[in-house]
Design a protein with these regions (language model features):
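A substrate-engagement module of RecA-like helicase motors
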Residues: 2-14, 19-22, 40-56, 66, ...
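Signature of the SF2 helicase/ATPase Hel1-core->accessory helical subdomain module
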Residues: 74, 80, 97-100, 104, ...
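Conserved RecA-like ASCE P-loop NTPase motor core of nucleic-acid helicases/translocases
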Residues: 88-96, 481-485, 572-584
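A contiguous, basic/glycine-rich beta-loop/short-helix subdomain that forms a polymer-engagement track
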Residues: 201, 205-206, 227-260, 273, ...
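Conserved interdomain hinge at the start of the Helicase C-terminal
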Residues: 532-579
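N-terminal targeting/trafficking signals and adjacent low-complexity tails
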Residues: 675, 686-693, 732, 736-812
Length: 812
């Protein structure tokens, strides 16, 4: 078989429009090494059911800089593994953006051409991605009954009706529609949503209760029909439930079955976890898995294993068990709860939030949700009511611990569906990740090829197995490769030393842990912040650890500082990354455009600046790079998984923006006290921890938040260099950053010598949050020397370039 270096030769790459990148070759080589590695020695462990053989997959970690061709390298390694062994491979991602890139941007065809080998590849998506023909017909009947005539909607309906049994399943998804149009149709000014039109989903919005105390919530009424109205429309169409199910699931079932037959399956992290839990029933016999966007794998697992409750789904379950419909009023209340949860998600950037924090930060929404929950009733389904009772109690007690559970609002990792969660115990993500790559078989069981377990090493002493790990059947993975642009822990001295433990990988199972960064790839310059701007939030005490996202007033001086940066040199295109939609709303308000609390708004273009608001999905916002009238995009959604590239006149592709502005570091909010105390107890109860003090546990949690922040910052900076010809200027405008001492001293002296009105004043004895202290560690090594020659953006709005400083300053 041809070696990797020969595959990535210039002669092979040039016809594909690709350039040779040594780092891409190295990534593919590392992945192949991991996939070829022998299984680690098995261990004999003692469980409650007797002695068993515990076997982990051969695993490896690969970190590579953004834009270096990780995805094509992974596909090449997967194709070669399929041909070499006959085994099937899964490639798992977190974002749908990367799945679309693999599917639509030619990565699969390029990988096939490089290897010279043909394989069957399927992209496996969930049923919520498929359009329900019966729901489309039901809405169409309802709109016709109400006299609604909309050309865009008619075009959408005609497209759905044009499907035939020979239509490819993926051509019946929302992704296929968005290949032609940016959004779903609007009817009477309201945008239809995917969860309203997808198979197996109920509408998430509906009429508010007739006695809703807040009469201003007019958006709860009108467009979206109640389930009863949909049922009436279905009856008019004479569509029986069995026929409806068969009609809706036809393409999805073909899609799912085809994926089981293919050599390589592209899917997402949650599906991989469900595949393991189902004993391989979802994807079939998969022997190897490559996790792309690995840094988001823990988030997907954490969300998947939380106990989630959605009111309208609870009513559906009750209807099935009782055999009759629930009262229409309860349907209305459930729909109103869903709308309220969606609005809360927009306020909190779809992060988990407890009732106590909600009451503090958004009291009107807390009161509204508490009233709706109090009115929500589910009769005749007692087995499903314990979680609902805990939720109601938590709101009555303002978020204190209720029974044995912690109640909070959460949002699904991919589709961002809201749910009320009851979590009785901390989700042990590391343990759950270990389950994906661990198998247990009885010692005296007859070994079979399907077991995928190597013979136990007789020299290994018996150990006590983790009973929780043992509970989950092995999915069949013999090899697991983890790849990402942000695997490392930027705070540790050896950034890769302990990363494998975060993913439940034993040291003995670790084949390779490598980092790759090209010596030359693009160019990057920097602009650093003015610490005299103070902090983004006015409450200094609560913001001391970098939190501040929720419930704290914004600092108008900081907002104006960011506005000046956006307006500086308007001829240069800018991508402005900020952690929260609240930031976007506040920046828009400084322009004189205010939005009412809870208002779901579409993005606004003002003076050439696009303000991304929750009403538009991120992939739709990204398409605005093709518009000549957009000079800047402000968004919290494009930190990762996005390639904002445009074609040059010479045919090469470069990033759209010339400036990338980081408004503030994306620091996760500190958890509520009740959740933090629970996490501390879990850390102290871990028998593997040698240090068991509360201070140690709190410090560990603080470092974990800082690591999450820096990993996301690394991804955000990576948006700026996607190819060898890209040249980007990075603005780091968080005034809490700890500035390099030598650079700051040089700038201070230069400004003083020029008798400038601008000054650089460093705070004295400031206690820095770890992410604000160690941010330089995420700058690519090849660009770190540029930090000492950074420009300085003063509070006045003047940009002092390094040439300005050195020409007139002390170096002159």
């Amino acid at each position: 078989m041809t070696n990797i270096q020969d595959l990535f030769s210039v002669d092979r790459l040039r016809p594909l429009g690709m350039q040779r990148r040594e780092v891409q070759c190295d990534i593919a080589q590392d992945l192949e090494t991991i996939l070829q590695a022998p299984l680690p020695p098995a261990k004999t462990v003692t469980t409650r059911d007797g002695q068993k053989t515990r076997q982990q997959a051969a695993c490896g970690l690969v970190q590579a800089a953004p834009g270096t061709g990780k995805t094509v390298a992974a596909l090449v390694a997967a194709i070669r593994h399929c041909h070499r062994t006959g085994e099937r491979v899964a490639i798992s991602t977190y974002t749908r953006a990367l799945q679309r890139q693999i599917l639509n941007d030619g990565d699969i065809e390029r990988a096939k051409a490089l290897t010279g080998q043909e394989v069957a590849v399927a992209v496996r998506v969930g049923r919520a991605n498929f359009i329900s023909r019966s729901r489309v017909e039901a809405y169409d009947a309802l709109f016709r009954q109400e006299g609604v005539d909309n050309a865009f909607w008619r075009e959408f309906v005609s497209w759905v009706r044009s499907w035939t049994p020979r239509t490819l399943p993926l051509d019946t998804t929302f992704m296929a529609w968005r290949d032609q149009f940016e959004s779903l149709p609007e009817v009477d000014g309201h945008n239809l949503t995917e969860d309203m039109l997808s198979i197996g989903q109920e509408s998430t919005k509906g009429g508010a209760p007739e006695d809703d105390p807040d009469e201003k919530q007019a958006d709860l009424e009108g467009l979206v029909p109640e389930d009863d109205a949909i049922a009436d429309a279905r009856q008019q169409e004479k569509l029986a439930p069995a026929d409806e199910d068969k009609k809706d699931l036809f393409y999805y079932r073909h899609h799912a079955e085809y994926a089981k037959e293919c050599d390589i399956v592209i899917t997402n992290h949650a599906t991989i976890a469900l595949h393991a839990q189902s004993r391989g029933a979802i994807l079939g016999n998969i022997e190897a898995v490559i996790f792309d966007e690995t840094d988001r794998l823990p988030d997907a697992i954490r969300s998947l294993y939380s106990h989630r409750m959605r009111p309208h789904l609870l009513l559906n379950t009750c209807e099935r068990r009782r055999g009759r419909r629930v009262p229409k009023r309860q349907r209305q209340i459930a729909s109103a709860i869903d709308v309220c949860l969606q609005e809360i998600g927009e306020i909190f950037d779809r992060r988990d939030v407890t009732p106590a924090r909600l009451k503090e930060s958004a009291p009107a929404h807390w009161q509204r949700l508490a009233d709706l929950l109090d009115a929500f009733r589910v009769r005749g389904c007692s087995s499903d009511l314990r979680g609902l009772r805990l939720v109601k109690e938590a709101f009555k007690e303002s978020g204190r611990k209720s029974g044995s559970g912690i109640v909070y609002l959460s949002f699904s990792p991919i589709r961002k569906y809201p749910a009320l969660c009851v979590d009785p115990d901390p989700v042990d993500v590391r343990n759950l990740l270990a389950r994906l790559i661990t198998s247990f078989t009885p010692v005296d069981a007859q070994q079979s090829p399907a077991a995928n377990v190597a013979p136990a090493d007789p020299d290994v002493a018996a150990e006590v197995a983790d009973e929780e790990i043992e509970d989950l059947p092995f999915a069949g993975f013999r090899h697991a490769a983890y790849i990402s642009a942000s695997l490392v822990n930027p705070i540790d001295r050896d950034p890769m030393a302990h990363v494998h433990h975060e993913y439940g990988i034993d040291t003995a199972s670790l084949v390779k842990a490598s980092q790759h960064e090209p010596p030359v790839f693009g160019s990057m310059r920097f602009v650093l912040s003015d610490p005299s701007v103070k902090k983004p939030f006015l409450d200094r005490d609560k913001d001391a650890d970098g939190e501040g996202q929720q419930g704290l007033p914004y600092n108008p001086a900081w907002l104006d500082y960011i506005r000046r940066a956006i307006d500086h040199d308007p001829k240069r295109r800018k991508l402005v990354l900020t952690p929260s939609f609240l930031d976007v709303r506040e920046l828009l308000a400084r322009r004189g455009v205010s939005l009412s609390d809870g208002e779901t708004s579409r993005s606004v273009i003002l003076d050439g600046v696009l303000y991304h608001l929750p009403g538009d999905p991120s992939h739709q916002v990204a398409t605005h790079v093709r518009r000549d009238d957009v000079r800047a995009i402000i968004t919290p959604s494009l930190w990762e998984g996005a390639n904002l590239v445009v074609d040059r006149d010479d045919g090469r592709r470069i990033v759209w923006m010339q400036d990338l502005i980081i408004t503030r570091l994306p620091v996760p909010p500190s958890p509520p006290d009740i959740v933090q105390n629970r996490m501390v107890r879990a850390i102290l109860a871990n028998p593997k921890k040698t240090i068991r003090t509360r201070e140690y546990a709190l410090g560990l949690l603080l470092r974990q938040r800082a690591t999450q922040s820096l990993r996301k910052l690394l991804q955000g900076i990576g948006r700026g260099v996607r190819g060898p010809d890209d040249a980007i200027r990075i603005w780091l405008l968080d005034p809490r950053l700890e500035l390099p001492a030598a650079w700051a001293e040089r700038v201070q002296e230069a400004l003083y010598d020029q008798d400038a009105s601008d000054t650089l004043t460093l705070p004295l004895d400031r206690q820095s949050f770890p992410a604000h202290k160690h941010w330089i560690n995420v700058i690519p090594r090849r660009f770190q020397s540029q930090i000492e020659q950074s420009a300085f953006f003063a509070q006045s709005g003047r940009l002092w370039t390094w040439a300005d400083i050195t020409h007139k300053g002390v170096a002159a």
